[in-house]
């Protein structure tokens, strides 16, 4: 007997199955058992048993799938939820069940007036016998489902109306739909044309239906039908296609119908406005905006809608219906239907109509969907229900049409879109006409219902509707009222009270705390909230809710009573909380949504992670009530301190807005930078901020009674950025232009009136800095203007010189202001302000500072120590400052701990001062700000900002307090040093470059004297580096001033960060500050002229170049007495000159690189003739140059002095800059180590150059011209003074350095790759940068360039020679000398013809230090000198023509490139300066792998890159200009340059990035094999390469190389030729090219350090020192390069030297060369490789240097592959790349030389060694230039646009065009091809400019990756550089760029060793330009002994 399942249990199981399936789960045995047991308590065993039995008897279905059993209800299987199974049961029997009849019966039987629910209908039907009989068999669920389906269908067809959960028969639908529609339409008044429609013309009708494409003969159904045509566009459609009812059609034909595309609102007649919110009348098809309706609608009405024109006038029930409709709309209309808002009448007569007339499908495609569809079931039911009568009819008709026509309408909408405008109109139009016609017809047909009279008709219509309704359910007035009341109550519970807002603000009201606030704007709350009229917000957590009930429930649970963050400020009942968008994301999002309700333009709501929100609250016992907030980006490159600010309406006009603005500036001041609100400001924001700025400035002026006050000082005191101060002063009419100066006019009445008002009406809430407890997240943003940093530096520098300078400063300030004014109003203002500030600083600061100095507080009174100790000290201090922030007390040096501690503190204070100055982004301000700013700022503003900061600085406070609390706190606020660095990047970092030196143990050991000497040395280095760095860093600095400053300072600091000798940092800082304080003028004599020049330069720049020059002369005069030795004086002079150009340019610095300006330091351009041989002078010049960056100091070229001058120039550009630059000048003169820091400082200076170059870009052009005129005057004196100063410095330094020499050599070469090698590099690159500066700004200061170049060259030559000799004598000096030589070289090239005398002088001077220098160095210097002389004589002469052409280009290339170069040089010099850096660079090479000294910069970050690699540093700095953080290309356009720069310099940038990843491996490899090789090519491989023992050799080699490279490195040497001068004008590369003489000179001496290869060409030298180990790798290629170069050096010395400089060969020396000239340019190229200098520069050195290095790199990379890019090889690569960068410069120069043919040919000589490479490079060079798109682009543009490529290549381009004014790039290429074919120069150029190296470097987006890659890449790039030139074109090509990007790692890792890769790049090469020959590249690589792939791959990647 079969056991049957218990039917009860079976039913339970089926219910369980249904329940489980309802939960979207699989009905498994387990789940069924659980469900049954939970509901019926049946045990599992029984359930399973019954389940099995049920399966057997078929009542349950068992499904097995994948081993799992599921159970289903056969009657109700899953997805087929239709009456299938049930049909089997009850409905199946009753297949004939007519659900329509059943439903009708149910509704009639229930007779519920409001409608019946589904449940009641189901209950009613189940109670009917026939139904129960029919459906009894099936489960209840089956019947329920069928019923639901039937009701749904009925609703869809319009038979039923759905109102919420209620259903009701549509009485209208009961009649024929057409009839009812007609009825509703017919009840409407007849349609008539409106007045404005009568006169309008009617378009010619198009006789084709736009929908079915039929004619009037046949429509879609092939029947004849007349068309309706649009009166505006003539498009036609069949009424049936438009879904018009006959009635509507009739009405529409009587009107002027518009299609949906042309439809305009009949009310406002604005066609373009808000088409989406347009409703189409169902009677006339006119369009109306919802807000234009009467009454306005907030939601799309459902059902039929009739416009106010057609609508009958309502009488008796008018009000009721209106309200009901409103409720209906509010409640019933779907939220999503904004368009058709139901109007009360519309509901009544329209609901049905719209369905009838096919409302949904009518012609209004867009609108109809809304309106017709809106008339769909749910809404319609609701609306109609409210209207009563309308409901039934409306629903049914519209519903019908809705479904079918919805798609149609959409389709039609698309169809009817002849014109974009007409689209909506047309659809709408169609609708209207149909409606009208329909209505007419309807009206007639249903006349019985509706009277003709509008009013009567309406009433009767309503009545009839009611009657219709009434047949089933009589709706009485009472029913309606009841319904309304209940509905309103329900709505109230949901929180909706008032009528919808016509303005469609969602929400229109919010309840927030105890306030109900009407919103001003809509906010993107989620849709379900945004449509609500009112939102309820929790005032503590800002959660938004729909109703008060929900809010009350939430408030019981919400435990918040303050924002979810730390309270950073509290005073009385006011608190500020700092909320991190990354931590409290929801809160911040809710805050943004709330803010948007009261802000017009706000786009940030959900992406809050990158922002900090400072929430202002008012506190009471209940909690902290939100008052307002402002948000700021965490890492804002533009230094915006507010991105959004909002005060809730209830707290407005109570001073809270001003409080928040003030608070934001307080935070900025604590960060040590000036801030500015995010631009553009809204109208309200502009008003608020202008009011704030006015009051702050007036109050500041009221409290500052100094006769002189600068914008910079104002900026420092207020935290307001100089641009805003300038615009405000201009607005207050307190800025005037008088006698070539911008002067701040104290309008005492205005000030007094303001203060009187203020006293009468005290501010209700004021920010009390004492109540702030906050530490900046980032000490200093890299965004801080370089100008600011420089200004800060200058401010400090100026302080010491105080009185001396006061007058000059004032004049300068005026000038500076004028120049700055050109830069920007703020800049000008700053200058003016600076005058008083300088004075004040001079007096008050000076007094207190000097006292402090005497108390061994040099930092603050940096001027006193400026001489030699000062700068160095300052650097030390600054570095220490960096450390200071990290370990201010801990790192006091053991040697002079107390002294240094004080110094450190002082430096911290001074740094803070600088920071403060930096904070005031105005360039001039920085100058004046220096000291005066600090006193004033300290006392007034410092009270607020600095107090807090002072608290932060423990030790610093001690000494800084006396100096100025402002500054100290600033420093600390900024993370003390970091901020400082960041802020006064130019100033501090310029000083910082000394830090490496300072850091070097020797300097530390000799606190005062040594400090002085090393400081001088550092100074030189600084200059070199500054020069170099300036070019590179300048660009970076503008955008990433803070970061740059930090990293570069860190570079130096971090170079010592490994902190070889924290003391040195302290020492440097101390000394610098001592310089300021202890040696107000005595020491200033060295730096004084620079500093003064800086001050003057800033002022002069601002005012005018003439004035600047005069003031510079004054400075010189001032300095001259102060200057100790002639060389020192010359240094200062040159610095002054340099500074002047810089000064003019620095103003731009703030903004970033000017478009047209070169990124090189201006002085680069200025000292084109400088020979690398004059390293000492060049060192000084480098400092000058870098300082001079703004001021193209061709004359400054004499040595690094231009760097100092550059610093000064920068200073002149900004008063603050002047001060900063002065420090720089001192620092630079003081220490090449500072030049290391100048990698950082270079950043700063570069910033200065940026400021100078950038500012000058626009601003300096006039002032620069003036400068040019005056400069020559000043320059000679400067040159003379500088060389003397340099000589003395060098001798002193050499004394010290000789002691330090070994250390320094190792350290500098290693640690400071930027040290010695870098120094050489720096010199050369910096010289180049200087030269390029000169070149860069030639346009602006062409005359100046020429005259100045000559003077500068003479001075630079003397200095360069002195420096070179000095360098040779001491490795450390050597580095610095090399660096200086580089600048000299550049300057020489540029100044060659002008400065041959100078060269001779410099040579002589060089000889003086020569005895002290190493033999190698001596040889190198000699060779450099010879080369320089020969080049000057031949190449430079040759280049003179080019120079003329170049100068034109120079004006705009100069600025851009000069600053970069300058910066790079700064970096190099600084790196060179630090003996410790040098040595420790091996261990710390990881950090500063390529340029160990630079590496600290690397450690620092980008800065590290620059400083670490003296030479690399320059390029690094160049990149740094872009991005102080070398790894942060994004920081600035130049960030690419940063990478490039770093890479170029010594692979340091790569090393830097790589160092980040694998510093040790990078360093060690670089240090040992690459270092050895790179020693000579140190310029490129300085940091990491020559980091190790080869450093000394490196130093020598570098010195030689540097000397040689001084002229653009080996390559640049060739380039160094006069064409290079042109190049100088064009770009750092150009400058580098000008260095060729130096390069060529060194080639003979270089051989001593390196093998013959190196002697031949500097490139080889570079490669040679390294080649010893990797020489086979590198040497073969370098020999080709260098061998060709030797010939070119001689050859090129005259011809190639300037432009071609043996670009191909230059590639080998490119390390040095690049660092100095290529360094900035090329490093820039590398860092800004994409379009700047990376490719070109890199290309060539890549070939030589890269070959050796590349081989090593290949070995390392192939082997140490595991290392993060095998830093060593990477370094090699980098070094090579750097070399290449220089080479690129050289090559670029050759392009130019090509223009000036001799060089090109000279370059062609190198082909023997470089032949394939050279040729390749040449072609690629050309290609690169072309591919770089730099060819036709203006240099500045190119530079800016292609940053990476632009810097160098662009510069080169400029160079190239010099000879031929054609597109620089193109010319370069064009010219280059002949010479380039053989010469690496052109190739390098090609690579550099068009080189995708830059691009690839950049494309390898991550700096680190690039860096790492870059190392390899650089190694490869070393190759690649040359190859890159070839590659450059291919790189330019997108495909190749990709390759470069994709290869970098690959190449570095495996490909490096594999030739396949090389060939691959060759293959891509075609992509770039055919010129690049893969094979050539290949051979090049082979020559190098490095895998071609290495070169090719990396390069190609680039």
Swiss-Prot record:
Which organism is the protein's source? Rattus norvegicus (Rat)
Instruction: Give the SUPFAM superfamilies listed for this entry.
Output: Acyl-CoA N-acyltransferases (Nat) (SSF55729), FYVE/PHD zinc finger (SSF57903), Winged helix' DNA-binding domain (SSF46785)
Location of region: Interaction with RUNX1-2: 1510-1635
Q: Which residues carry this modification: Phosphotyrosine?
A: 900
**Record-linked SMART domains:** H15, PHD
Q: What is this protein called?
A: Histone acetyltransferase KAT6A
Per UniProt, residues of the MYST-type HAT domain are 502-776
Composition-biased stretches (Acidic residues): 785-797, 1042-1052, 1064-1077, 1106-1119, 1229-1240, 1281-1298
| Lineage, opening ranks | Eukaryota, Metazoa, Chordata, Craniata, Vertebrata
Biased amino acid composition, Basic residues: 865-874, 1008-1029, 1147-1173
């Amino acid at each position: 007997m079969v056991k049957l399942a218990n039917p009860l249990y079976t039913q339970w199981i089926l219910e369980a199955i249904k329940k489980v399936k309802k939960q979207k789960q699989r009905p498994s045995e387990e789940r069924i058992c659980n469900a049954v047991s939970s509901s019926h308590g049946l045990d599992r065993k029984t359930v399973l048993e019954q389940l099995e039995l049920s399966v057997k008897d078929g009542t349950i279905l068992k499904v097995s799938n994948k081993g799992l059993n599921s159970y289903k209800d056969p009657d109700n299987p899953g997805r087929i939820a239709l009456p299938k199974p049930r049909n089997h049961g009850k409905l199946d029997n009753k297949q004939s069940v007519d659900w329509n009849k059943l439903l009708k019966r149910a509704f009639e039987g229930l007779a519920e007036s409001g409608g019946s629910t589904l449940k009641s209908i189901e209950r009613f039907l189940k109670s009917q016998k026939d139904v129960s009989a029919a459906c009894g068999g099936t489960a209840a669920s089956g019947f329920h489902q069928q019923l639901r389906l039937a009701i749904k269908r009925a609703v869809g067809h319009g038979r039923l109306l759905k109102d919420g959960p209620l259903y009701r028969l549509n009485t209208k639908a009961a009649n024929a739909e057409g009839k009812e529609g007609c009825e509703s339409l017919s009840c409407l008044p007849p349609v008539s044309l409106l007045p404005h429609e009568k006169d309008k013309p009617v378009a010619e009708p198009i006789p084709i239906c736009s929908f079915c494409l039929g004619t009037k003969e046949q429509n879609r159904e092939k029947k004849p039908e007349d068309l309706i045509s649009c009166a505006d566009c003539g498009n036609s459609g069949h009424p049936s296609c438009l879904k018009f009812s006959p009635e509507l059609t009739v009405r529409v034909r009587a009107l002027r119908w518009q299609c949906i595309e042309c439809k305009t609102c009949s009310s406002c007649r604005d066609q373009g406005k808000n088409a989406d919110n347009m409703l189409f009348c169902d009677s006339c098809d006119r369009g109306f905006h919802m807000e234009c309706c009467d009454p306005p609608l907030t939601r799309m009405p459902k059902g039929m809608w009739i416009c106010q024109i057609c609508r009958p006038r309502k009488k008796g029930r008018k009000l009721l219906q209106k309200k009901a409709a409103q409720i209906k709309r509010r409640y019933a209309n779907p939220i999503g239907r904004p368009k058709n808002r139901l109007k009360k009448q519309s509901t009544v007569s329209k609901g049905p109509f719209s369905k009838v007339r096919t409302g949904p499908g009518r012609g209004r495609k867009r609108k109809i969907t809304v309106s017709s569809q809106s008339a769909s079931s749910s809404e319609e039911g609701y609306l109609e229900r409210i209207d009563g009568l309308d409901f039934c009819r409306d629903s049914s008709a519209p519903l019908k049409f809705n479904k079918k026509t919805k798609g149609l309408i959409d389709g039609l909408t698309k169809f009817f879109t002849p014109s974009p405008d007409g689209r909506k109109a047309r659809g709408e139009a169609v609708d209207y006409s149909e409606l009208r016609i329909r209505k007419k017809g309807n009206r007639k047909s249903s006349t019985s219902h509706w009277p003709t009279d509008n009013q009567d008709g309406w009433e009767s219509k309503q009545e009839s509707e009611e009657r219709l309704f009434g047949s089933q359910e009589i709706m009485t007035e009472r029913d309606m009222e009841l319904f309304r009341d209940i509905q309103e109550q329900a709505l109230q519970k949901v929180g909706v009270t008032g009528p919808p807002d016509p303005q469609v603000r969602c929400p229109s009201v919010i309840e927030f705390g105890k306030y109900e606030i009407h919103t001003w704007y809509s906010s993107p709350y989620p849709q379900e909230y945004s449509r609500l009229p009112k939102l309820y917000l929790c005032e503590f957590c800002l959660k938004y809710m729909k109703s008060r009930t929900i809010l009350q429930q939430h408030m019981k649970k919400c435990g918040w009573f303050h924002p979810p963050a730390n309270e950073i400020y509290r005073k009385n009942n006011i608190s500020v909380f700092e909320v991190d968008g990354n931590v409290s994301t929801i809160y911040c999002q809710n805050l943004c949504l709330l803010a948007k309700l009261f802000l017009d333009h706000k786009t940030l709501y959900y992406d809050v992670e990158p922002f900090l929100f400072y929430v202002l609250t008012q506190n009471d016992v209940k909690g902290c009530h939100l008052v307002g907030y402002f948000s700021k980006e965490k890492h804002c490159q533009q230094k915006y301190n507010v991105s959004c600010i909002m005060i809730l309406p209830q707290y407005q006009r109570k001073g809270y807005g001003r409080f928040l603005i003030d608070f934001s500036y307080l935070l900025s001041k604590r960060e040590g930078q000036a801030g500015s609100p995010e631009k553009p400001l809204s109208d309200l924001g502009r008003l608020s901020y202008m009011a704030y700025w006015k009051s702050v400035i007036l109050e500041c002026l009221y409290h500052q009674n100094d006769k002189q006050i600068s914008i910079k000082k104002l900026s420092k005191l207020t935290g307001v950025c100089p641009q805003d101060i300038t615009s405000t002063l201009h607005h207050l009419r307190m800025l005037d232009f008088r006698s070539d100066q911008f002067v701040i006019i104290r309008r005492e009445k205005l000030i007094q009136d303001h203060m009187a008002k203020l006293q009468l009406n005290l501010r209700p809430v004021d920010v009390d800095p004492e109540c702030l407890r906050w530490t900046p997240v980032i000490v200093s943003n890299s965004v801080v203007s370089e100008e600011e940093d420089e200004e800060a530096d200058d401010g400090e520098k100026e302080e010491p010189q105080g009185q001396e300078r006061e007058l000059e400063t004032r004049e300068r300030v005026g000038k500076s202001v004028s120049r700055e004014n050109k830069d920007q109003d703020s800049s000008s203002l700053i200058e003016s302000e600076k005058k008083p500030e300088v004075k004040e600083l001079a007096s008050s600061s000076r007094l207190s500072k000097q006292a402090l100095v005497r108390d061994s507080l040099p930092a603050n009174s940096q001027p006193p120590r400026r001489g030699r100790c000062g700068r160095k000290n300052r650097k030390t201090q600054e570095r220490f400052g960096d450390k200071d922030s990290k370990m201010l007390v801990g790192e006091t040096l053991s040697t002079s701990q107390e002294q240094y501690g004080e110094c450190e503190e002082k430096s911290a204070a001074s740094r803070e001062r600088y920071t403060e100055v930096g904070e005031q982004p105005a360039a001039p301000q920085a100058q004046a700000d220096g000291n005066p700013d600090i006193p004033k700022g300290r006392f007034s503003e410092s009270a607020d900002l600095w107090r807090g900061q002072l608290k932060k600085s423990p030790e610093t406070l001690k000494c800084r307090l006396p100096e100025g609390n402002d500054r100290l706190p600033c420093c600390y606020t900024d993370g003390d040093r970091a901020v400082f660095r960041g802020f006064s990047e130019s100033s501090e970092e310029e000083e910082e470059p000394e830090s490496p030196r300072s850091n070097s143990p020797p300097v530390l050991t000799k606190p005062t004297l040594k400090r002085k000497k090393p400081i001088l040395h550092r100074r030189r280095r600084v200059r070199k580096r500054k020069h170099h760095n300036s070019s590179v860093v300048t660009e970076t600095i503008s955008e990433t001033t803070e970061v740059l400053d930090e990293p570069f300072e860190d570079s130096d600091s971090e170079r010592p960060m490994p902190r070889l000798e924290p003391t040195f940092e302290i020492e440097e800082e101390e000394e610098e500050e001592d310089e300021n304080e202890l040696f107000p003028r005595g020491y200033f004599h060295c730096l004084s002229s620079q500093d003064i020049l800086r001050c003057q330069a800033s002022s002069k720049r601002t005012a005018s170049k003439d004035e600047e020059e005069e003031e510079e002369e004054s400075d010189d005069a001032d300095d001259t007495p102060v200057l100790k030795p002639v060389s020192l004086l010359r240094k200062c002079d040159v610095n002054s000159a340099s500074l002047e150009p810089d000064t003019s340019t620095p103003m731009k610095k703030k903004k970033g690189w000017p478009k047209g300006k070169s990124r090189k330091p201006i002085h680069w351009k200025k000292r084109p003739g400088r020979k690398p041989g004059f390293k000492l002078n060049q060192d000084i010049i480098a400092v000058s140059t870098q300082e001079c960056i703004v001021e193209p100091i061709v004359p400054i070229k004499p040595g690094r002095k231009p760097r100092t001058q550059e610093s000064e120039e920068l200073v002149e550009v900004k008063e603050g800059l002047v001060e900063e630059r002065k420090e720089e000048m001192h620092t630079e003169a003081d220490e090449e180590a500072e030049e290391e820091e100048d990698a950082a400082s270079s950043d700063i200076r570069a910033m200065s150059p940026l400021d100078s170059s950038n500012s000058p870009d626009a601003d300096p052009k006039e002032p620069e011209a003036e400068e040019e005129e005056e400069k020559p005057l000043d320059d000679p004196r400067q040159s003379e003074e500088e060389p003397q100063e340099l000589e003395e410095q060098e001798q002193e330094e050499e004394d010290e350095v000789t002691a330090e020499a070994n250390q320094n050599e190792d350290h500098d070469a290693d640690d400071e790759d930027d040290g010695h090698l870098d120094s050489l590099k720096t010199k050369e690159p910096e010289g180049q940068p200087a030269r390029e500066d000169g070149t860069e700004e030639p346009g602006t200061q062409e005359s100046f360039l020429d005259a100045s170049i000559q003077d500068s060259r003479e001075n630079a030559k003397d200095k360069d020679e002195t420096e070179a000799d000095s360098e040779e004598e001491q490795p450390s000096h050597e580095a610095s000398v090399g660096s200086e030589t580089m600048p000299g070289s550049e300057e020489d090239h540029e100044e060659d013809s002008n400065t041959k005398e100078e060269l001779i002088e410099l040579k002589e001077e060089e000889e003086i230090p020569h005895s002290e220098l190493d033999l190698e160095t001596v040889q190198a210097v000699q060779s450099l000198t010879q080369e320089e002389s020969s080049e000057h004589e031949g190449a430079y002469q040759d280049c003179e023509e080019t120079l003329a052409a170049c100068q034109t280009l120079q004006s705009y290339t100069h600025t851009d490139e000069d600053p970069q170069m300058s910066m790079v040089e700064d970096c190099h010099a600084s790196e060179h300066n630090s003996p410790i850096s040098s040595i420790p660079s091996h261990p710390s090479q990881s950090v500063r792998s390529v340029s160990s000294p630079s590496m600290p910069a690397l450690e620092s970050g980008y800065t590290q890159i620059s400083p670490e690699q003296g030479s690399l540093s320059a390029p690094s700095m160049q990149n740094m200009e872009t991005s102080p953080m070398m790894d942060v290309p994004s920081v600035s356009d130049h960030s690419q340059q940063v990478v490039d720069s770093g890479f170029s310099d010594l692979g340091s940038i790569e090393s830097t990035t790589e160092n980040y990843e694998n510093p040790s491996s990078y360093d060690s490899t670089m240090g040992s094999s690459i270092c050895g090789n790179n020693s000579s090519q140190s310029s490129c491989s300085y940091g990491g390469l020559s980091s190790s023992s080869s450093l000394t050799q490196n130093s020598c080699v570098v010195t030689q190389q540097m000397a040689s490279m001084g002229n653009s490195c080996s390559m640049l040497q060739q380039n160094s030729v006069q064409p290079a001068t042109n190049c100088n004008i064009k770009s750092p590369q150009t400058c580098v090219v000008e260095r060729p003489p130096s390069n060529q000179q060194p080639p003979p001496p270089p051989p001593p350090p390196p093998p013959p290869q190196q002697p031949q060409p500097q490139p080889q030298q570079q490669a040679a020192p390294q080649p010893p180990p990797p020489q086979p790798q590198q040497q073969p290629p370098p020999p080709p390069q260098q061998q060709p170069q030797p010939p070119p050096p001689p050859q090129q010395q005259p011809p190639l030297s300037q432009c071609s400089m043996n670009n191909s060969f230059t590639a080998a020396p490119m390390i040095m060369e690049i660092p100095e000239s290529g360094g900035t340019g090329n490093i820039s190229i590398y860092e800004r490789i994409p379009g700047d200098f990376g490719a070109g520069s890199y290309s060539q050195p890549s070939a030589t240097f890269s070959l050796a290095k590349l081989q090593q790199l290949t070995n390392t990379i192939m082997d140490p592959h595991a290392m993060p890019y095998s830093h060593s090889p990477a370094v090699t690569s980098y070094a090579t790349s750097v070399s290449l960068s220089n080479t690129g410069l050289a090559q670029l120069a050759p392009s130019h030389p090509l223009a000036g043919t001799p060089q090109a040919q000279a370059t062609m000589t190198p082909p023997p060694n470089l032949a394939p490479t050279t040729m390749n490079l040449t072609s690629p060079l050309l290609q690169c230039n072309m591919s770089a798109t730099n060819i036709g682009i203006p240099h500045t543009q190119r530079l800016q646009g292609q940053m990476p490529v632009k810097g160098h290549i662009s510069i080169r381009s400029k160079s190239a065009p010099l000879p031929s004014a054609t597109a620089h790039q193109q010319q370069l290429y064009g010219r280059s091809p002949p010479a380039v074919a053989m010469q690496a120069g052109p190739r390098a150029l090609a690579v550099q400019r068009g080189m995708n190296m830059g691009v690839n470097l950049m494309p390898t987006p991550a700096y680190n990756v690039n860096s790492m890659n870059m190392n390899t890449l650089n190694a490869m790039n070393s190759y690649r550089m040359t190859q890159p030139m070839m590659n450059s074109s291919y790189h330019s090509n997108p495909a190749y760029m990709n390759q470069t990007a994709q290869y970098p790692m690959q190449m570095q890792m495996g490909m490096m060793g594999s030739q396949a890769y090389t060939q691959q790049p060759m293959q891509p090469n075609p992509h770039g330009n055919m010129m690049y020959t893969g094979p050539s590249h290949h051979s090049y690589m082979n020559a190098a002994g490095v895998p071609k792939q290495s070169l090719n791959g990396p390069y190609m990647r680039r």
